[in-house]
Amino acid sequence: MVDKIIFTVTPIFSIPPRSAAAVETWMYQVAQRTSIPNRIACIKNEGYSDFLMVNDHCSVHRIGFSRLYKRLFQKWTRLDPLPYSQRILNIAKDFNVTDDSVIIVHNSIKLYRQIRKRAPKAKMVMHMHNAFEPDGLDQNVKMIVPSMFLKKHYQAYLPNADIAIVPNGIDLEAYQKNAVPLQKSDLGITPEKKTIFFAGRISPDKGVTLLLQAFEQLLKVRNDIELVVVGNYMSKSKGEKAAYQREVRELAERLKPHCRMVGGVTPEEIYNYYSLADLVVIPSQFQEPFCMVAIEAMGAGKPVLVSTRGGMTEFVKEGDTGFHLQEPMTPESIASDINKALASPDLNDISLRGQRCVEEKFPWEKVTQRFEEVVNNWFK
Protein backbone atom coordinates (compact mmCIF):
# COMPACT_ATOMS: atom_id res chain seq x y z
CA MET A 1 0.00 0.00 0.00
CA VAL A 2 1.12 3.53 -0.75
CA ASP A 3 2.05 5.39 2.44
CA LYS A 4 2.85 8.85 1.03
CA ILE A 5 2.54 10.73 -2.26
CA ILE A 6 4.41 13.63 -3.82
CA PHE A 7 2.28 15.33 -6.50
CA THR A 8 4.22 17.59 -8.85
CA VAL A 9 3.85 19.37 -12.17
CA THR A 10 5.75 21.51 -14.65
CA PRO A 11 6.63 24.95 -13.18
CA ILE A 12 3.98 27.16 -14.77
CA PHE A 13 1.01 27.67 -12.42
CA SER A 14 1.05 27.83 -8.64
CA ILE A 15 -1.44 25.71 -6.70
CA PRO A 16 -4.27 26.32 -6.08
CA PRO A 17 -4.49 28.04 -9.49
CA ARG A 18 -6.14 31.45 -9.82
CA SER A 19 -6.97 31.00 -13.48
CA ALA A 20 -8.13 28.15 -15.69
CA ALA A 21 -5.53 25.40 -15.17
CA ALA A 22 -7.13 21.96 -15.37
CA VAL A 23 -4.02 19.96 -14.45
CA GLU A 24 -3.25 21.95 -11.31
CA THR A 25 -6.93 21.95 -10.37
CA TRP A 26 -7.03 18.14 -10.58
CA MET A 27 -3.98 17.88 -8.33
CA TYR A 28 -5.35 20.25 -5.72
CA GLN A 29 -8.83 18.73 -5.63
CA VAL A 30 -7.66 15.11 -5.35
CA ALA A 31 -4.73 15.79 -3.02
CA GLN A 32 -6.98 17.42 -0.44
CA ARG A 33 -9.49 14.56 -0.58
CA THR A 34 -7.29 11.47 -0.63
CA SER A 35 -6.66 9.70 2.66
CA ILE A 36 -3.03 9.09 1.61
CA PRO A 37 -0.72 11.69 3.22
CA ASN A 38 0.73 13.89 0.50
CA ARG A 39 2.63 16.98 -0.47
CA ILE A 40 2.14 19.06 -3.59
CA ALA A 41 5.35 20.50 -5.07
CA CYS A 42 4.83 23.34 -7.55
CA ILE A 43 6.28 26.64 -8.67
CA LYS A 44 5.93 29.76 -6.53
CA ASN A 45 4.51 32.64 -8.56
CA GLU A 46 3.96 36.24 -7.51
CA GLY A 47 1.36 36.63 -4.78
CA TYR A 48 1.80 33.12 -3.37
CA SER A 49 3.47 32.08 -0.11
CA ASP A 50 6.09 29.35 0.20
CA PHE A 51 3.76 27.00 2.05
CA LEU A 52 0.08 26.18 2.45
CA MET A 53 -1.35 23.68 4.92
CA VAL A 54 -4.52 22.45 3.22
CA ASN A 55 -5.56 19.92 5.87
CA ASP A 56 -3.96 17.41 8.21
CA HIS A 57 -2.79 15.15 5.36
CA CYS A 58 -2.17 17.60 2.50
CA SER A 59 0.18 20.56 2.14
CA VAL A 60 1.44 22.66 -0.76
CA HIS A 61 5.16 23.45 -1.06
CA ARG A 62 5.94 26.18 -3.58
CA ILE A 63 9.37 26.39 -5.16
CA GLY A 64 10.60 29.93 -5.78
CA PHE A 65 13.41 31.20 -7.97
CA SER A 66 14.63 34.80 -7.71
CA ARG A 67 14.98 36.86 -10.88
CA LEU A 68 18.74 36.92 -10.43
CA TYR A 69 18.87 33.14 -10.01
CA LYS A 70 16.80 32.55 -13.15
CA ARG A 71 18.83 35.03 -15.16
CA LEU A 72 22.19 33.70 -14.01
CA PHE A 73 21.65 29.94 -13.84
CA GLN A 74 18.68 29.21 -16.10
CA LYS A 75 19.16 31.75 -18.87
CA TRP A 76 22.82 32.80 -19.09
CA THR A 77 24.94 29.87 -17.94
CA ARG A 78 22.29 27.11 -18.00
CA LEU A 79 24.27 25.49 -15.18
CA ASP A 80 21.51 25.32 -12.59
CA PRO A 81 23.07 24.08 -9.32
CA LEU A 82 19.70 23.33 -7.73
CA PRO A 83 17.13 22.67 -10.47
CA TYR A 84 13.39 22.31 -10.03
CA SER A 85 13.58 18.50 -10.19
CA GLN A 86 16.11 18.32 -7.34
CA ARG A 87 14.06 20.71 -5.23
CA ILE A 88 11.08 18.39 -5.66
CA LEU A 89 13.19 15.49 -4.43
CA ASN A 90 14.33 17.62 -1.49
CA ILE A 91 10.68 18.17 -0.56
CA ALA A 92 10.17 14.40 -0.78
CA LYS A 93 13.20 13.79 1.44
CA ASP A 94 11.93 16.29 4.01
CA PHE A 95 8.62 14.38 3.93
CA ASN A 96 10.52 11.24 5.02
CA VAL A 97 9.35 9.24 2.03
CA THR A 98 9.88 5.48 2.19
CA ASP A 99 10.06 2.58 -0.25
CA ASP A 100 6.25 2.60 -0.21
CA SER A 101 5.99 6.25 -1.26
CA VAL A 102 5.16 7.38 -4.80
CA ILE A 103 6.03 10.45 -6.88
CA ILE A 104 3.30 11.38 -9.36
CA VAL A 105 4.36 13.73 -12.16
CA HIS A 106 1.57 15.53 -13.98
CA ASN A 107 1.67 16.21 -17.70
CA SER A 108 5.42 16.77 -18.08
CA ILE A 109 7.43 13.98 -19.66
CA LYS A 110 10.55 16.13 -19.37
CA LEU A 111 10.10 16.57 -15.61
CA TYR A 112 9.40 12.84 -15.19
CA ARG A 113 12.68 12.02 -16.96
CA GLN A 114 14.61 14.55 -14.87
CA ILE A 115 13.30 13.13 -11.60
CA ARG A 116 13.81 9.54 -12.78
CA LYS A 117 17.43 10.34 -13.64
CA ARG A 118 18.06 11.76 -10.17
CA ALA A 119 16.06 9.06 -8.34
CA PRO A 120 16.28 5.87 -10.45
CA LYS A 121 14.82 3.64 -7.72
CA ALA A 122 11.87 5.86 -6.83
CA LYS A 123 8.34 4.59 -7.40
CA MET A 124 6.86 6.91 -9.99
CA VAL A 125 3.64 7.45 -11.93
CA MET A 126 3.24 9.56 -15.06
CA HIS A 127 -0.17 11.29 -15.11
CA MET A 128 -0.86 12.60 -18.61
CA HIS A 129 -3.68 15.04 -19.33
CA ASN A 130 -2.78 15.71 -22.98
CA ALA A 131 -1.69 13.76 -26.04
CA PHE A 132 2.07 14.08 -26.50
CA GLU A 133 4.74 11.86 -28.01
CA PRO A 134 6.17 10.02 -24.97
CA ASP A 135 9.85 10.37 -25.87
CA GLY A 136 12.14 8.89 -23.24
CA LEU A 137 9.48 7.34 -21.03
CA ASP A 138 10.04 3.88 -19.57
CA GLN A 139 8.44 1.24 -21.81
CA ASN A 140 6.71 -0.23 -18.75
CA VAL A 141 5.75 3.12 -17.23
CA LYS A 142 2.71 3.32 -14.97
CA MET A 143 0.47 6.01 -16.39
CA ILE A 144 -2.84 7.65 -15.48
CA VAL A 145 -4.98 9.29 -18.17
CA PRO A 146 -8.50 10.81 -18.05
CA SER A 147 -10.09 9.06 -21.03
CA MET A 148 -10.08 5.95 -23.22
CA PHE A 149 -9.09 8.19 -26.13
CA LEU A 150 -5.87 9.16 -24.33
CA LYS A 151 -5.24 5.60 -23.19
CA LYS A 152 -5.32 4.39 -26.80
CA HIS A 153 -3.03 7.23 -27.83
CA TYR A 154 -0.31 6.18 -25.39
CA GLN A 155 -0.82 2.45 -25.90
CA ALA A 156 0.12 2.96 -29.55
CA TYR A 157 3.52 4.30 -28.44
CA LEU A 158 4.00 2.21 -25.28
CA PRO A 159 2.31 -1.19 -25.69
CA ASN A 160 3.91 -2.49 -22.47
CA ALA A 161 2.87 0.46 -20.32
CA ASP A 162 0.37 -0.03 -17.51
CA ILE A 163 -2.23 2.64 -18.24
CA ALA A 164 -5.25 3.33 -16.03
CA ILE A 165 -8.15 5.74 -16.57
CA VAL A 166 -8.94 8.21 -13.79
CA PRO A 167 -11.24 10.95 -15.10
CA ASN A 168 -11.33 14.63 -14.30
CA GLY A 169 -13.97 15.83 -11.89
CA ILE A 170 -16.11 18.68 -10.61
CA ASP A 171 -17.07 20.04 -7.23
CA LEU A 172 -20.81 19.47 -6.98
CA GLU A 173 -21.02 21.74 -3.94
CA ALA A 174 -19.81 24.61 -6.11
CA TYR A 175 -23.11 24.32 -8.02
CA GLN A 176 -25.46 23.15 -5.32
CA LYS A 177 -24.36 25.27 -2.35
CA ASN A 178 -21.70 27.84 -3.13
CA ALA A 179 -22.59 29.21 -6.57
CA VAL A 180 -24.13 32.67 -6.90
CA PRO A 181 -25.71 32.29 -10.34
CA LEU A 182 -25.61 35.30 -12.62
CA GLN A 183 -28.83 36.43 -14.24
CA LYS A 184 -29.00 37.30 -17.92
CA SER A 185 -29.95 40.83 -16.90
CA ASP A 186 -26.54 41.16 -15.18
CA LEU A 187 -25.03 41.20 -18.67
CA GLY A 188 -27.81 43.26 -20.20
CA ILE A 189 -29.49 40.25 -21.83
CA THR A 190 -33.29 40.06 -21.76
CA PRO A 191 -34.72 36.79 -20.35
CA GLU A 192 -36.39 35.68 -23.59
CA LYS A 193 -33.12 35.70 -25.54
CA LYS A 194 -31.41 32.34 -26.14
CA THR A 195 -27.83 32.56 -24.92
CA ILE A 196 -25.08 30.60 -26.66
CA PHE A 197 -22.17 30.13 -24.26
CA PHE A 198 -18.47 29.36 -24.69
CA ALA A 199 -15.81 29.04 -21.99
CA GLY A 200 -12.16 28.17 -22.49
CA ARG A 201 -8.85 29.27 -23.94
CA ILE A 202 -9.03 31.85 -26.68
CA SER A 203 -6.74 29.91 -28.99
CA PRO A 204 -7.02 28.27 -32.44
CA ASP A 205 -7.42 24.75 -31.04
CA LYS A 206 -10.65 25.75 -29.27
CA GLY A 207 -12.43 26.93 -32.42
CA VAL A 208 -13.56 30.32 -31.12
CA THR A 209 -13.45 32.11 -34.48
CA LEU A 210 -15.55 29.34 -36.03
CA LEU A 211 -18.16 29.84 -33.31
CA LEU A 212 -18.16 33.61 -33.81
CA GLN A 213 -18.58 33.15 -37.56
CA ALA A 214 -21.39 30.66 -36.96
CA PHE A 215 -23.08 33.16 -34.65
CA GLU A 216 -22.78 35.79 -37.38
CA GLN A 217 -24.65 33.41 -39.70
CA LEU A 218 -27.36 32.89 -37.08
CA LEU A 219 -27.90 36.63 -36.64
CA LYS A 220 -28.88 36.84 -40.30
CA VAL A 221 -31.92 34.62 -39.75
CA ARG A 222 -32.95 35.11 -36.11
CA ASN A 223 -33.02 37.98 -33.62
CA ASP A 224 -33.55 36.04 -30.40
CA ILE A 225 -29.98 34.95 -29.66
CA GLU A 226 -26.96 36.26 -27.78
CA LEU A 227 -23.40 34.96 -27.45
CA VAL A 228 -21.34 35.00 -24.24
CA VAL A 229 -17.63 34.13 -24.44
CA VAL A 230 -15.69 33.50 -21.23
CA GLY A 231 -11.91 33.40 -21.62
CA ASN A 232 -8.87 35.63 -21.54
CA TYR A 233 -8.79 37.37 -24.91
CA MET A 234 -6.05 39.85 -23.91
CA SER A 235 -3.30 37.46 -22.79
CA LYS A 236 0.40 38.30 -22.94
CA SER A 237 1.00 35.65 -25.58
CA LYS A 238 2.94 36.53 -28.71
CA GLY A 239 2.99 35.26 -32.25
CA GLU A 240 0.20 33.06 -33.58
CA LYS A 241 -1.90 33.10 -30.40
CA ALA A 242 -1.72 36.90 -30.13
CA ALA A 243 -2.77 37.25 -33.77
CA TYR A 244 -5.63 34.82 -33.19
CA GLN A 245 -6.87 36.73 -30.15
CA ARG A 246 -6.76 39.94 -32.16
CA GLU A 247 -8.92 38.27 -34.82
CA VAL A 248 -11.36 37.12 -32.12
CA ARG A 249 -11.61 40.66 -30.71
CA GLU A 250 -12.26 42.11 -34.16
CA LEU A 251 -14.97 39.54 -34.89
CA ALA A 252 -16.60 40.10 -31.50
CA GLU A 253 -16.57 43.86 -32.05
CA ARG A 254 -18.40 43.37 -35.33
CA LEU A 255 -21.05 41.28 -33.58
CA LYS A 256 -21.85 43.81 -30.86
CA PRO A 257 -24.23 44.29 -29.10
CA HIS A 258 -25.19 40.63 -29.42
CA CYS A 259 -21.76 39.22 -28.47
CA ARG A 260 -20.29 39.73 -25.02
CA MET A 261 -16.63 38.97 -24.29
CA VAL A 262 -16.45 38.45 -20.52
CA GLY A 263 -12.71 37.84 -20.24
CA GLY A 264 -11.00 35.36 -17.96
CA VAL A 265 -12.58 34.25 -14.69
CA THR A 266 -11.21 32.20 -11.80
CA PRO A 267 -12.02 28.49 -11.36
CA GLU A 268 -14.29 29.44 -8.45
CA GLU A 269 -16.18 32.09 -10.44
CA ILE A 270 -16.88 30.00 -13.54
CA TYR A 271 -19.63 28.11 -11.72
CA ASN A 272 -21.62 31.35 -11.48
CA TYR A 273 -21.59 31.87 -15.26
CA TYR A 274 -23.15 28.66 -16.57
CA SER A 275 -26.56 29.90 -15.38
CA LEU A 276 -26.49 32.31 -18.33
CA ALA A 277 -26.41 29.52 -20.91
CA ASP A 278 -29.22 28.03 -22.95
CA LEU A 279 -26.65 26.02 -24.90
CA VAL A 280 -22.93 25.51 -24.25
CA VAL A 281 -20.95 25.03 -27.47
CA ILE A 282 -17.49 23.40 -27.49
CA PRO A 283 -16.18 23.45 -31.10
CA SER A 284 -12.69 22.09 -30.33
CA GLN A 285 -10.48 21.76 -33.40
CA PHE A 286 -8.00 19.36 -31.82
CA GLN A 287 -8.32 15.93 -30.24
CA GLU A 288 -9.74 17.05 -26.89
CA PRO A 289 -8.40 14.63 -24.23
CA PHE A 290 -11.35 15.16 -21.88
CA CYS A 291 -12.68 18.76 -21.52
CA MET A 292 -13.50 20.16 -18.11
CA VAL A 293 -15.93 22.72 -19.53
CA ALA A 294 -18.16 19.93 -20.84
CA ILE A 295 -18.63 18.26 -17.45
CA GLU A 296 -18.91 21.62 -15.68
CA ALA A 297 -21.71 22.69 -18.01
CA MET A 298 -23.46 19.32 -17.77
CA GLY A 299 -23.12 19.42 -13.98
CA ALA A 300 -24.86 22.80 -14.04
CA GLY A 301 -27.75 21.21 -15.93
CA LYS A 302 -26.96 22.88 -19.24
CA PRO A 303 -27.15 21.20 -22.66
CA VAL A 304 -23.83 20.85 -24.48
CA LEU A 305 -23.04 20.77 -28.20
CA VAL A 306 -19.53 19.37 -28.62
CA SER A 307 -16.89 18.42 -31.13
CA THR A 308 -16.54 14.69 -31.73
CA ARG A 309 -12.75 14.99 -31.79
CA GLY A 310 -11.09 13.25 -28.87
CA GLY A 311 -12.55 12.05 -25.59
CA MET A 312 -15.72 14.09 -25.06
CA THR A 313 -17.95 11.58 -26.84
CA GLU A 314 -17.17 9.07 -24.08
CA PHE A 315 -19.63 10.93 -21.85
CA VAL A 316 -21.46 13.29 -24.23
CA LYS A 317 -23.71 10.87 -26.10
CA GLU A 318 -25.63 12.25 -29.09
CA GLY A 319 -29.30 12.71 -28.22
CA ASP A 320 -28.81 11.19 -24.77
CA THR A 321 -26.53 13.38 -22.64
CA GLY A 322 -25.78 16.08 -25.21
CA PHE A 323 -25.36 16.91 -28.89
CA HIS A 324 -22.54 16.42 -31.41
CA LEU A 325 -21.23 18.90 -33.96
CA GLN A 326 -21.15 17.66 -37.55
CA GLU A 327 -17.88 17.09 -39.35
CA PRO A 328 -16.34 18.84 -41.12
CA MET A 329 -17.03 21.83 -38.87
CA THR A 330 -17.77 25.04 -40.74
CA PRO A 331 -19.54 28.24 -39.66
CA GLU A 332 -22.59 27.04 -41.59
CA SER A 333 -22.61 23.55 -40.06
CA ILE A 334 -22.14 24.90 -36.52
CA ALA A 335 -24.96 27.40 -37.03
CA SER A 336 -27.20 24.58 -38.26
CA ASP A 337 -26.28 22.38 -35.29
CA ILE A 338 -27.01 25.19 -32.83
CA ASN A 339 -30.43 25.72 -34.40
CA LYS A 340 -31.21 21.99 -34.22
CA ALA A 341 -30.12 21.69 -30.60
CA LEU A 342 -32.12 24.72 -29.46
CA ALA A 343 -35.18 23.41 -31.32
CA SER A 344 -34.93 19.87 -29.94
CA PRO A 345 -38.11 18.83 -28.09
CA ASP A 346 -35.88 16.71 -25.83
CA LEU A 347 -33.59 19.58 -24.84
CA ASN A 348 -34.59 19.63 -21.16
CA ASP A 349 -34.52 15.84 -20.81
CA ILE A 350 -31.09 15.68 -22.43
CA SER A 351 -29.85 18.35 -20.03
CA LEU A 352 -31.15 16.38 -17.05
CA ARG A 353 -29.56 13.15 -18.28
CA GLY A 354 -26.27 14.97 -18.78
CA GLN A 355 -26.45 16.33 -15.26
CA ARG A 356 -27.18 12.88 -13.80
CA CYS A 357 -24.26 11.43 -15.76
CA VAL A 358 -21.88 13.95 -14.21
CA GLU A 359 -23.32 13.52 -10.72
CA GLU A 360 -22.86 9.76 -10.96
CA LYS A 361 -19.40 9.63 -12.55
CA PHE A 362 -17.42 12.81 -11.96
CA PRO A 363 -17.67 14.20 -8.40
CA TRP A 364 -14.17 14.75 -7.03
CA GLU A 365 -14.93 12.25 -4.28
CA LYS A 366 -15.48 9.47 -6.83
CA VAL A 367 -12.46 10.54 -8.85
CA THR A 368 -10.34 10.39 -5.69
CA GLN A 369 -11.68 6.94 -4.83
CA ARG A 370 -10.77 5.68 -8.29
CA PHE A 371 -7.31 7.27 -8.02
CA GLU A 372 -6.64 5.53 -4.70
CA GLU A 373 -7.77 2.17 -6.12
CA VAL A 374 -5.36 2.53 -9.04
CA VAL A 375 -2.22 3.51 -7.11
CA ASN A 376 -2.83 1.04 -4.28
CA ASN A 377 -3.35 -1.76 -6.81
CA TRP A 378 -0.09 -0.86 -8.56
CA PHE A 379 1.96 -0.65 -5.37
CA LYS A 380 0.57 -3.35 -3.10
Task: Outline where the language-model segments fall.
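N-terminal strand-loop element at the rim of the active site
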Residues: 9-17, 33-79
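Nucleotide-activated donor-binding/catalytic signature segment of Leloir-type glycosyltransferases, i.e.
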Residues: 119, 240-265
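A short helix/loop element that forms part of the nucleotide-sugar donor recognition site in Leloir-type
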Residues: 176-189
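Conserved donor-binding/catalytic core segment of Leloir-type glycosyltransferases
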Residues: 189-206, 212-216, 227-230
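Short alpha-helical donor nucleotide-sugar binding micro-motif in glycosyltransferases
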Residues: 264, 272-277
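Short hydrophobic beta-strand element within catalytic cores of glycosyltransferases
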Residues: 303-306
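A short, well-ordered alpha-helix in the C-terminal region of glycosyltransferases
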Residues: 346-361
